């Protein structure tokens, strides 16, 4: 009996003495778990911050779409490429408040910009005498948000539209 007790104590002593030693794979796994938990917290914080900014921008403009310029002046094809590379779109206001948000950007910069008008558009804001096919195949908005026919070769303010499905 004493032999069993001594053997048990000896094993316990060895276990306690080596208790700080951790299997390297287990140590790596624990490190990865900690890193993943940290990334999850950071992602949640980033998502929360993004939603706050998006809601504030939407509240200020009355639109779920954001219209952003890089202040460059380009033709229609260059605009299309720039917006596509930025994961955005050429502006296509579908509602009056969206057109107003777009026009606010143009007014701030004192420039005109391209937009796209769909064939089935429920909302339009053509200026008097427009559309005028003779002026060009593209459409531009002035600083008041009125739409005009334009040449696709005109160099206008680069504005891209971003919208989010939340």
Curated annotation (Swiss-Prot):
Pfam family, one: Lectin_C
Free-text function comment from the UniProt entry: This phospholipase A2 inhibitor binds directly phospholipase A2 in the presence or absence of calcium.
Source organism phylogeny: Eukaryota, Metazoa, Chordata, Craniata, Vertebrata
Record keywords, A-Z: Calcium, Disulfide bond, Glycoprotein, Lectin, Phospholipase A2 inhibitor, Secreted, Signal
Gene Ontology MF terms: carbohydrate binding; phospholipase A2 inhibitor activity
Name the record gives this protein: Phospholipase A2 inhibitor
Secreted among keywords: yes
Signal peptide feature range: 1-19
Highest taxon of the lineage: Eukaryota
Compartment list: Secreted
Family named by the database record: Belongs to the alpha-type phospholipase A2 inhibitor family.
Tissue note: Expressed by the liver.
One Gene Ontology term, aspect cellular component: extracellular region
Self-association and partners: Homotrimer; non-covalently linked.
Disulfide bonds: 83-160, 138-152
Positions bearing carbohydrate: 122
Domain C-type lectin: residue ranges: 46-161
């Amino acid at each position: 009996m004493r032999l069993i007790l001594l053997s048990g104590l000896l094993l316990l002593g060895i276990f306690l003495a080596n208790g700080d030693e951790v299997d390297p794979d287990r140590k790596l796994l624990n490190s990865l778990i900690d890193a993943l938990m940290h990334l999850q917290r950071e992602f949640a914080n980033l998502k929360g911050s993004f939603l706050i900014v998006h809601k504030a921008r939407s509240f200020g403009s009355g639109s779920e779409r954001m219209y952003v310029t890089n202040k460059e002046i380009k033709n229609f094809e260059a605009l299309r490429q720039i917006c596509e590379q930025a994961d955005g779109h050429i502006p296509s206001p579908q509602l009056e408040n969206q057109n107003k948000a777009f026009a606010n950007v143009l007014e701030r910069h004192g420039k005109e910009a391209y937009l796209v008008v769909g064939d089935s558009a429920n909302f339009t804001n053509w200026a008097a005498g427009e559309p005028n096919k003779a002026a060009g195949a593209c459409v531009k908005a002035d600083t008041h948000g009125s739409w005009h026919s334009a040449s696709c070769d005109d160099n206008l303010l680069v504005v891209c539209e971003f919208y989010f499905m939340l």
